[in-house]
């Protein structure tokens, strides 16, 4: 085969010349439009195209095994039909034709198509040319005929003219006719040529447009093929096509078989034909389009770390959803951490944070209190940053009976200690006094061990702590605790050494003991100011006040006086006539009657304000303690009190806090530790002392509750089933009767209805005004509930000297009593080489053949052991009795 040019080859394969030159260039062959192409270059181009199209890696043979299961209804016995499952297994082999053959075939098809187009073009041109020639021939014949006719006429005229005028040789009309005939012939030839040129140009333009369209289509197909090769696998595509072909063939065979069975099968059971028709219809309607075999999920190769947003409470299921794990994974993790939880259990924020961090996630703690923040942000302080000096808040702390209230009493020039039950302070007293050098606010805290929380609360709200130490008693446990509270609050400490009027006062001892706990006197090079006072005579009190004001001046205590007030609840109680009453220490701003107060879980509008002396006031500035009325409930001591603008929003915030407090409380109560599981199992064996407790103020209630709960032991548990502030009511009495509880009133009494219920139900009611007595009596009641303890006490010991045989009693041991007394009614043990070998009771005790009840030390006796005959010489018989021992807590 001779070499062809690039242009001719492009025409043969049906591609544009530019595309073919580009493919030659990609194959490493540089060609122009008029260059010749050899067979070797064609083969090189073909190999390159095969490689680019993936022809080398394409599978040449594929075997598919298919299994189809169908149901055939056949006639059975009795005219009934039954379904028989038919399983058809097929193996089909598909052979893919070589890519080169496909390419050659495509080229041959393109070449044949081009040749057909060229042949059609040539035939069209030949047809047009033949038509033009036929038309021209017809015109020529017509012209020749006209010319012959004209010639004949001309000859006739010429002959006539010759006859008439012999001198004239030719006719002018004939010449004109000849010229006109030549002109018409030239015009006809020119029109025919112009028409042929136009038709040829149209055919060439049509061929060019067809070639461009084919080139664009082939380029698009090439681009789509490459795109498909990038995202799919040739084997998968081949498998899909083969499967589609096989599915189509299988369905045709299945339908043909079913039609044949339907014709030949006898009467079937009711509904069989409809079922088969439905199945055939389903098979006919089933899509045979190939489905993708590639899944779209890839297994993660690394752990996914998420930002988990946790609110104040969250359930186990919600936490699992936030971390995108199963709830069982969280339950397993918490079991490893020592907690047993369920899927719906509420977790507090700290627990959820630990679990999420343990599982490798980042935790973002969120506070769901946007409304609360909005309400508090709407507070305005009219004074802005204008700060004014304020009075110092001084807390009097120290051990019980060291003279705290007496010292404050002297300062206030009023008898306060005498009004306290038992001479000890039961709750915080807040007072402000005017001195010559300025005003001072005092907080008097209890010194008893039960009032730890109240002392801590006092240290939290104070500026200066005055530690009262008795000069004759020294440092005591509550003194040390007060020092710890002051250090924890980073509050300056002033030591007031009281009872200096007593002859037993020892100043050096007090300084030395305080120095051991980090409180060093200025005389000894320390930082703490010491004042030596006597609350009885008033000696040194002025020096103490001067030292307090000096310390306050050093601290530069300032606060915003104008604007909305904020403070802290010092004490709260439920008054029978006035309702909830809260003692608030104003810390900033001015508290006025009529203000809306948000106080912990409670809210309300201030209906009345009273100072510590019970006088009504209308406003209170910084460092002033005041009693307010009008709250919705009794707030907890230590809560922050804030004045807000909108009562409706304050109510919403209070309700939100109550709900959140309940959720957090439940979340903490639901914790069940693994180490407590066995204790929980045996909890039913623990005896409980149920108590209904009512107190006059919140602080005393907390102190008594903590003290009573601390009395619980492994055997007796104190269970406070109800507690509150205020008088004992009929509801309390009914609850105590139903739960077999003791009713305890601390500085409160039962009302008339409650007394009737108590009398009718025989409920144990006890009143107390001193916390010592309450704790002691509860402890005595718990002691009576303890299960008795029994102890075995040895009362006698006898040594076997000889053994006698008795026909009635068997072996009789002749013994000498070496210790104590042998009693016939007491149980005994037989010891051999100091090892107990038998435990039982005496059957016979005789002395000189007489039955006796007991034998004393140093006497001989005969002992018969019941159901035991292996008594030997040298054994010891030990007599003991079981004694009940009284138990104490």
Curated annotation (Swiss-Prot):
Compositionally biased intervals (Basic residues): 257-270
Region annotation G1: where it falls in the sequence: 398-405
Span list, region G2: 423-427
Main location: cytoplasm
Region annotated G3, chain positions: 444-447
CDD domains: IF2_eIF5B (cd01887), IF2_mtIF2_II (cd03702), mtIF2_IVc (cd03692)
Keyword Transport set for record: no
Any single Gene Ontology cellular-component annotation: cytosol
Chain spans, region G5: 534-536
Record localization: Cytoplasm
UniProt cross-references to SUPFAM superfamilies, sorted A to Z: Initiation factor IF2/eIF5b, domain 3, P-loop containing nucleoside triphosphate hydrolases, Putative DNA-binding domain, Translation proteins
UniProt domain tr-type G: residue ranges: 389-558
Region named Disordered: 115-293
The UniProt record lists the keyword GTP-binding: yes
Record-listed GTP binding positions: 398-405, 444-448, 498-501
Segments of this protein annotated with the region G4: 498-501
Keyword set, alphabetical order: Cytoplasm, GTP-binding, Initiation factor, Nucleotide-binding, Protein biosynthesis
Chain intervals with Basic and acidic residues compositional bias: 115-236, 271-280
Gene Ontology MF annotations: GTP binding; GTPase activity; guanosine tetraphosphate binding; translation initiation factor activity
Family: Belongs to the TRAFAC class translation factor GTPase superfamily. Classic translation factor GTPase family. IF-2 subfamily.
Function summary: One of the essential components for the initiation of protein synthesis. Protects formylmethionyl-tRNA from spontaneous hydrolysis and promotes its binding to the 30S ribosomal subunits. Also involved in the hydrolysis of GTP during the formation of the 70S ribosomal complex.
Name by which UniProt lists this protein: Translation initiation factor IF-2
Organism: Shewanella sp. (strain ANA-3)
Gene this protein is translated from: infB
